Amino acid sequence: MKTMMKEMLLALGMMLNVVVCQAQNTVSRLSPENGATEVNIDTHLTMTMSDDAVIGQRGSVSVYDKKTGRLVDRLDMSIPAGPTKGQPNHPTAQYTPVPYRYRSQNITNRNTKAGTPSGVNVWDTGRYQLDIIGGFSDGFHFYPIIAHGRQLTIYLHHNMLEYGHEYYVTIDKGVVEGFDGMKGKKAWTFRTKETAPDRSQRLLTVSADGKGDFSTLQGAMDFIPDSVASAQDGYRVLVKNGDYEELVYFRNKRFVTIEGESREGVLIHYPNNEVFNPHPADIKTNEVKGTFPSRRAAFAADNCSDLTLRNLTLRTDCKGQAEGLLVNGERNYFENVHIIGDGDALQANGSCYWMNCRIDGGGDTILGRGPSFFNHCTITSYGTFMWIRNTEENHGNVFVDCHLKGLSEYAEIGRLPDNKGKNYPHAECVLLNCTLEDIPARGWGTIDDSAKTATILEFNSHDTDGKPVDTSGRNPLMRQLNPIRDAELIGRYSDSHWVLRW
């Protein structure tokens, strides 16, 4: 009997041991590898676990300078990443009384406290993760760790690592469920490259595998100086095929070309929207020129001019008011770029030329003050394609030889409802020789009285078989152009130089 009892207890112990072992999650791969050298200063830290990873809500990830023992960066996992509910309306919120100043200063997490107001807004007292990106001192909410299956990516605060330093990483128990953590100076070490790229070459390579000058696009853009004087002094950034899950924001850049290896192969994306990174509660944003910058886009080029973006896919991974791309500036050119967002998938303020681009959105898919010239672009939308907000100072949106595909019965070409007591009487939309697919016969949605002076023109719209679209049911404010009577006007709108003034 005693022998049988011992055997039963032994078997039970073995079973419990198996359960305990199965509950443990261990590291099967580190990147950078332990002891790695020649690491880029903008590197993410990734861990591949033995089992699917679940992120915890306690403990910290810490990075130390190995030589001095100085704490370089710390991610406190007890702090929530960002808001999950929209902020309440602020009845006294207003546009900034003076234009927002885009100062060219070296503002980073190393020399400035994230959350420092950059304008007339008040301090944000919310207790969320904050990271200064692209010199925006107010900071962005961010996810310190993102998990996809067995892989964990750790996002250090930007610009904390330096060239020619050796670092070690510690991870507390609780940061990852079922993982005992990582302790000591030898568990995970790496050394960064000795020197920065040669600025005189003006050619930078970004590669997600760490084999380029930078591992992230943000790292490359941070390296490029502000307001380059001429095209001859401009920079070219080549982005290798890869998955770049990063929030990209840069400002004050000029004469920069960002070119991907291929549109399908380069994906730059992040889970961002107006809820996660809202505008300051006391400030209105996005509506008028010179107001406080938006932080809700996955990719934002702010106060930038003479940019070229080519062969990239830009995507937000969130629903709601969520741009895949937000651009503010003049004379910006986009070719073969795929933009994926939800509401306001593309926000374009300032003159932009779009060549052979694809834009996919959920509604008000194209937003902004314009002017924008779309040439051979494809746009899909579940809701209204655009909400144009240009003033009399410039043209609005012009589409030439484009394809608009509706994905629901609500996919009207545009709308102009009153917006919090105001409207856009000078709004302009022109469609020339466009393919319209599954667009409601009425064409346009709501146009309130205060916007009935808007310019809405259409010429030679046809279906996917090349047959003319029946425009008899169009909104009466949508004017159909005649090839003979309106030949001069059609010619003008077909000319990007006339529309964009460059």
Language model regions located:
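Sec/Tat signal peptide C-region and signal peptidase I cleavage site
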Residues: 19-23
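Sequence-level preference for short, compositionally simple segments enriched
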Residues: 195-502
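Small side chains
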Residues: 13, 59-61, 260
